[in-house]
Amino acid sequence: MKLAYWMYAGPAHIGTLRVASSFKNVHAIMHAPLGDDYFNVMRSMLERERDFTPVTASIVDRHVLARGSQEKVIDNITRKDKEQRPDLIVLTPTCTSSILQEDLQNFVARASISSDSDVILADVNHYRVNELQAADRTLEQIVRYFLNKARRQGVLTRSLTDTPSANIIGIFTLGFHNQHDCRELKRLLQDLGIKVNQVIPEGGSVEHLQDLPKAWFNIVPYREVGLMTAKYLEREFGMPYLSTTPMGIVDTAEFIRQMEKYVNSFLSKEKVNYESYINYQTQFVSQAAWFSRSIDCQNLTGKKVVVFGDATHAASITKILVREMGIHVGCAGTYCKHDAEWFNEQVQGFCDEALITEDHTEVADTIARIEPSAIFGTQMERHIGKRLEIPCGVISSPVHIQNFPLGYRPFLGYEGTNQIADSVYNSFTLGMEDHLLDIFGGHDTKEVITKSLSTETDLTWNPESQRELNKIPGFVRGKIKRNTEKFARQEGITTITVDVMYAAKEALST
């Protein structure tokens, strides 16, 4: 446990609650002190949904500490069972309430006796795993529980659907553009004549989990959540799964070819061939292939960027920038330390260096050192970019409300390639616009203000040097200011004059 100004992945119980609240008619009870119960507020604010968040906090207060939690937890479970009539109640502690070392499994067993709903305790080590790992584990636990239940009742069958079908595993609440990605995946599968058997956990019913084995194969669009479930289904039922993320033209084509291979492995007579579909989509539907050859995109060739996010999005965006747009990735990084080996394999040869860290200050220092033309990252990298006056495109969770758009903005599939191309192009400062505004003023009559880029206050710019700095085009002003301040510190100068500016320029060019 640690005190942090910013966390890329939250505590484990958030992952469990995200999965539980994604299913239909599943209620979660969080055994937690006040302060840990912010999930309801966070989800209600960010997700554009009309329904209430199905999570109840069983508060650990002084009475609980004096008498124990058993009575309160069991009362909350039985009350919610009678009020909500859920198919499943998931009990989860938080890392704080886990300190009490209570036998919550016993509470669940006691509550199950008088409840009509199924009741389970989230099987997660709250000290060892983060939000994403806990979500992956909880989803697998729920799927395993209901498939075992169906097997005991004798209603579990492996009879495949008549036509090609797939399960989409890992779409869930508070995910980065997950709802849009799901729609795009469904459209892609429909175009190829593949039926969607089930989508879990988002909008799925635990009562229908027994039908998961009827699909021909599983699709795991994001490595962070769903991989454990897919591996479990492969072990138990021999179901193949695709973990290639269909992001960008190259990987989307590879994803479709893998589906073709899986579908043909089940067909005995008429085999399918999706190559004509790939060619048509690449040439006429996706604008990204055409855009990458346009003069606008060629202006970005060789520009240096930094990419940081979850393993899936950071790796995919890195490959898209290099392979499809000719952009130079100075550093690609992820906060998914548990998936570092896979990430390093994916970005090898596509970037100058890889960064695996959960420390936002390390990311900020790397960005300041590389001085990229643009950043592609999370909400935190956007804050860093604003401070350093470097534009940032948001490509991964964690994000704030502006990245839960009402409009249709997928990142997967062929429509996703258009969205990514737009996001990349619009993230770069196109120089000339700022330059013309600096020269002619535009409609903005304010004096140009140069933001301070450093947190240190040991340097001052006199009025003449400030005016000289304001004459420099905006798209390079920040870099010149940083270089001048760096030179001044090296030389022990505290007041920056015009002469110091020119001396810094001369020192840099020699």
From Swiss-Prot:
| Localization annotation | Plastid, Chloroplast
One Gene Ontology biological process = photosynthesis, dark reaction
Top-tier EC class = oxidoreductase
Note how many cofactor molecules are bound and how: Binds 1 [4Fe-4S] cluster per heterodimer. The cluster is bound at the heterodimer interface by residues from both subunits.
SUPFAM superfamilies tied to this protein: Helical backbone' metal receptor
Catalytic residue list: D296
This enzyme's EC code(s): 1.3.7.7
GO CC, any one term: chloroplast
Q: Which CDD domains match?
A: Pchlide_reductase_B (cd01981)
Gene3D superfamilies assigned to the protein according to its UniProt record, in alphabetical order: 1.20.89.20, Nitrogenase molybdenum iron protein domain (3.40.50.1980), Proto-chlorophyllide reductase 57 kD subunit B (1.10.8.550)
Q: What does this protein do?
A: Component of the dark-operative protochlorophyllide reductase (DPOR) that uses Mg-ATP and reduced ferredoxin to reduce ring D of protochlorophyllide (Pchlide) to form chlorophyllide a (Chlide). This reaction is light-independent. The NB-protein (ChlN-ChlB) is the catalytic component of the complex.
Q: Which PANTHER family match?
A: LIGHT-INDEPENDENT PROTOCHLOROPHYLLIDE REDUCTASE SUBUNIT B
The family annotation for this protein states: Belongs to the ChlB/BchB/BchZ family.
Q: Per its record, how is this protein called by name? A: Light-independent protochlorophyllide reductase subunit B
Q: Which organism is it from?
A: Angiopteris evecta
Q: Which gene encodes it?
A: chlB
